[in-house]
């Protein structure tokens, strides 16, 4: 059969899959220690993003706003940047980095962010001679792209402005992309097992924050400014997600001769194998027996489920391109049929991704078609469910849950945001243990659906 890639036919958006660029840049920059991003736009551009971060991660984050109002939209909002930076520096004595994140309104009126940064830097040098607070621009016009584009812009801006050539440090850069804290923990685990000294860009493991006796309720990233500066001196860079850090990896290669490997996103057995081989290639470190055992456990667990429960089940997947394509590849490994892939970003490059060509080759040997829609929204999913009724399982974030509920289709929550199930951000989807968790989560969702519908639930008696 075939794989067809098409753009959403409607000009409008009904029930969007994603939010806008600034949200992605905000998620990237809060992964840096001693950093508070300043969102140059209306107050909602930070308030509602903080809300959705809190819903997903159940933590609080410091994200400032220049609180642009009507007068600033007419006369220019540069003074709001100045006031915002001065307030942050005065109130946070440990603050070392302030990314200035633009929005649709400030990009439209053409505020000179770089010029304002130069002006404020002179003020800071005079008023705070013993402090060094770096200001960097992050341009995220939210009338194009999505949170994926914004995350990539955020990481790229951090590295282009802070990376500094020095002595080789022997570290391996890992640009994680927009992943959960549980995924970062899994990345660190695998690197530790291989004995690799790594530079995690960006380390959000600390978003799984404890409640301490001092009642500190705010959460901070764990990547330091020095870590970002040292990325120029690494032995190599691996970007786990092509569209969420791939440009930063290419910049390090072009500007500082740091070898870069972009992808594949290590979801599933095959992609994790490739990731480990890439680590071995760049570092020379062997793959230890402990990871071979983890791989074997994952394969054993998935083999128990694949043919008996997963075979011929048709799956719809939506989310960011790297996650969706990675999940589709995983589905093929376990005999699930990914018949509908919805890429929420309007980046046309995703529609020409080489990984889709590989999926097309596999589709040629299958008995089903794979429909890929880029710049998609959740109405595409709802229409497919109602018109064809051929979806047995949905993989995606919580925004699509009502489609699953209304049409009585089992659903596994993956991606961002997931707020109607507890603790999912703690669980990895990458690596061998992530593959094992995905298999278990899919199976349990299907088992519960069988029980509620009284559909062959007797099979579970011997499970």
Curated annotation (Swiss-Prot):
Transport found in the keyword field: no
Cofactors: [8Fe-7S] cluster
An annotated GO BP: nitrogen fixation
Binding note for cofactor: Binds 1 [8Fe-7S] cluster per heterodimer.
Keywords: ATP-binding, Iron, Iron-sulfur, Metal-binding, Nitrogen fixation, Nucleotide-binding, Oxidoreductase
UniProt: [8Fe-7S] cluster binding residues: 20, 45, 104, 142
Keyword Iron: yes
GO cellular component: vanadium-iron nitrogenase complex
EC number(s) on file: 1.18.6.1
Matches recorded under InterPro entries: ChlB/BchB/BchZ (IPR050152), Nase/OxRdtase_comp1 (IPR000510), Nase_comp1_CS (IPR000318), Nase_VnfK (IPR014281)
Record field: catalytic activity: N2 + 8 reduced [2Fe-2S]-[ferredoxin] + 16 ATP + 16 H2O = H2 + 8 oxidized [2Fe-2S]-[ferredoxin] + 2 NH4(+) + 16 ADP + 16 phosphate + 6 H(+)
Enzyme class: oxidoreductase
GO MF annotation terms: ATP binding; iron-sulfur cluster binding; metal ion binding; nitrogenase activity
Quaternary organization: Hexamer of two alpha, two beta, and two delta chains.
Protein role: This vanadium-iron protein is part of the nitrogenase complex that catalyzes the key enzymatic reactions in nitrogen fixation.
Family in the record: Belongs to the NifD/NifK/NifE/NifN family.
NCBIfam families: vnfK_nitrog
Protein name: Nitrogenase vanadium-iron protein beta chain
